[in-house]
Amino acid sequence: MSLNRVLHIFLIAYLACTALTHDFDDTIAVVGAGYSGLSAAFTLVKKGYTNVEIYESQGEVGGYVYSVDYNNVAHDLATYALTPAYWKFQEAMKSIGVGFCELDVAIVQTNSTPVSVPFEKWMAAYWAAKVPNPLNLVRKVSTQVSTYVEVWKKLFNMDFIDTSTKRTNRLFPLKTNDVDVLAQFSMPMKDFVALHKLDLLEPLFIQATDSQAYGPYDTTPALYYMVWFPPNLFNGEENTVPCGTYNSMQSMAEHMAEWLKSKGVTFHMNTKVTKISRATDGSSPSLLEEGVATPKLFDTIISTNKLPSANRAEVVTPLLPKEREAADTYEELQMFSALLETNRSDAIPTTGFLMVDADAIIAHDPNTGFWGCLNAERRGGYSDENAILSSDTVTRVSAIYYYTERANNERIDFSLDEKIQQVKTNLATWDSATWTNLTSRTFGGYFQRWRTPDVMGQKPWNLADIQGEGDVYYVNSAACGFESVGHVFDCADNLIKDFF
């Protein structure tokens, strides 16, 4: 395949990194020093790459999603603590000499009395869970979810904005003295595990709330975050945690950053980001930088008028969840634009890889020769992906379908023609045979969007609408994507090489 075609491959950042061959000499840039970026850089370093740079606009590591007010007291929480992403991050920390006490999960119950469940046992149950027939499961728990939505509304304040950063907090704070309302609802662990495993939590909440305005962070906080992590989660004896005692996710991320620096990874902190403005007449927003021309690629994208007008850091009134999702993407577009500027001393080379967040598009711009990555889909699918895919510069898209079945860790082989035909004929069905092969989260929200709208409560995408002039295939777009991680890396390595 010619490199003159814009190649968009939906991959998690570190998965894309690991697919590269070791003779790739260009700079590999990672945008964002949160868990996604640190994990990407860590994987690259472990695989022997020495040309890694991390760009962070906010000037600190660890991200902004790890704290929440609990009864008006700030606690450190982990957005991904119930997922393989955090689990693998901890494994990465252990591999560089950081020890951990056994992690206990404290489940908030009536009167906030915690019941400890060993984290390892929870994870073991997660992986071992049998996935029932999805349709029966949906019918079984839809009433429960509807009930839980009401509980969730009582527990979480959707209008919360962090006054120090003006950022909308993705983990909504519990209202004072409302913790015991959790006693009004309970879901059997096996049902919760099955829903989580099938990536059905978000669609069920959408169905229950009769709205598509809620993104994944907003629709499932009570299910995801009914598990409460006490502030001393990472505390331990000095001999148990040889590299120091970690009392927060932030400090652990900082330690990872220091380790990466010791291995030669360059951090560009407080990287200048282009500003966003909207014309007073309400026309399309634009990216502006004094004395710097905005790259054509982003002029095209922004001209679609599908993205919000305000930088999230400047938001002073609550955004709808959909706008919050798009604002995240918009920030990353700003960063991408800034890094493409050739007259800035900290600009990365015009050839290289740019990794943005956990779900991303790897892009090659034939006009500049730049290989990069746009975060368009945003896990939940509410930033208008079509707006980006239909823009003039990135219309020619081609990628690969790939699927790993988590239960047996075996690759399911399809030629591209067979796979695209399967998408067209089978994804609208909900029969057991289809689900036997499609139970992994590795396709994440993208795969679910093609399901039947009457069951999922969502309008399925029309594949033809997003094909543009090329073909659109999806690859392993999990929210976290660590399932069968070694196997996926090996397969991705072979698949990417096919394009080079």
From Swiss-Prot:
Coiled coil: none annotated. Pfam families: Amino_oxidase. It catalyses: (5Z,8Z,11Z,14Z,17Z)-eicosapentaenoate = (5Z,7E,9E,14Z,17Z)-icosapentaenoate. It comes from the Eukaryota. Transmembrane segments: none annotated. Its cofactor is an oxidized flavin. Residues 1-21 form the signal peptide. GO terms for molecular function: oxidoreductase activity; polyenoic fatty acid isomerase activity. InterPro entries: Amino_oxidase (IPR002937), FAD/NAD-bd_sf (IPR036188), Zeta_carotene_desat/Oxidored (IPR050464). Optimum pH is below pH 6.0 with (5Z,8Z,11Z,14Z,17Z)-eicosapentaenoic acid as substrate. Keywords: Isomerase, Signal. It is an enzyme of class 5 (isomerase). Its EC number is 5.3.3.13. Glycosylated. Homodimer. Involved in the biosynthesis of conjugated triene-containing fatty acids. Catalyzes the isomerization of a wide range of substrates containing three or more methylene interrupted olefins into a Z,E,E conjugated triene functionality. May be involved in a stress tolerance mechanism as response to intertidal habitats with direct sunlight, desiccation and high temperature. This is Polyenoic fatty acid isomerase. It comes from Ptilota filicina (Red alga). The lineage of its organism: Eukaryota, Rhodophyta, Florideophyceae, Rhodymeniophycidae, Ceramiales.
